[in-house]
């Protein structure tokens, strides 16, 4: 308890001074912010500092000690996409080439003014109205969870007239009756929207401003503004020459993206996203799932798509690079080493720069630091912390046999953040970011509620009760994650954060106390 109190005092002192820790010198074990609205945070354990990345689109929320949406972090609401894309009405009217809405400007129909009114992101008026909605949406409503209306993935919590906006993980939708994120087919409001639509007709210039500004704002607007005066804003930033579909006129949900395509279109709140099917599968518009080409009527007589990866394995992006490509069954997946590590193609692992042969020619630096992965080959634990993977070398027959009977590719290891990679008998183990688990249906790291294995194996941690707001209306102790050393206590409506004192201890929601991490299955 003394350790927890000291940690709390240190956090208050840091906030009062307006300073942020950059290393763990004289710091207690715990999590610390690296700055305001930062997508990374600092972890201190035994005096050792590690910089960790939040999942995509999230930033570190220091009061809650979690990665959170930008609009949920005080002071960061207006510093994200809305302020970074196009500020002011003039940008959409006169400088279309410099913004994501430029494609709409070129067409003459989807101009900056129209896209600003429709998307709420391109103009100051749009962002202002968004703030007004945040302040007034909970007026005269009781505290609790509410749907944003209709068939949607968005919902919000009301706590003392203050709104906290959230969205369901893809591809779930919010059900107002059960107050949970569930499959679209089970949501009453979505049943009338479950119709098959053709995704090939959305190519007009009217929707191009939204598509280029929201779905492919990184480069599509600029590319279309320069290459065409006819408003070819649908051209994707990847330069593929294909038309980028929009969600204009489409209900929230899943839609085809062409005929016999290896990807599909998802629409959520008018925002279009292209999702890839797993390797060797194409989208079946009849049942709205990825399926074998032989079972999709539209694929009859069409040539089989060629794989983007000729050989399975892991390949570096370049000499002394922290990025690498994982090729699995002809599909390329871009992966990244943890902060401070480089990918070694010769050893097929992330390692310190001094231990990567590809880095020696460029850096010439030699370090006496011992590699955490080498000492961790026997246990798999040190390797998982330092490089984001456990090589499995020397860990015994049991780990080598994990790939027996499994196809080449990625596989979930139960309801856990660990990912098993099988490549022609070679075993690798990767780890998802904190509080996420690997979903072997979608082949991505996702929230535990989306994993079928979590729903089957872990009935204690995966709570099927209706969603509750973080308003501490219920007294008790609550864990901050699947295998987390941090937890919080709610007493008379007040929230107090705690951290387990022992270095190897995590909080058990079932026992309502800190226990040794080796006793919990989800921590293995």
UniProtKB/Swiss-Prot annotation:
Residues 21-78, 135-192, 244-301, 306-361, 400-456, 469-524 form the Chitin-binding type-2 domain. One of its GO terms (cellular component) is external encapsulating structure. Disulfide bonds join 54-67, 168-181, 277-290, 337-350, 432-445, 500-514. Residues 1-18 form the signal peptide. Residues 382-392 have a biased composition (Low complexity). GO terms for molecular function: chitin binding. SUPFAM superfamilies: Invertebrate chitin-binding proteins. Glycans are attached at residues 103, 119, 208, 212, 355, 497. PANTHER family: CHITIN BINDING PERITROPHIN-A, CHONDROITIN PROTEOGLYCAN-2. This is Chondroitin proteoglycan-2.
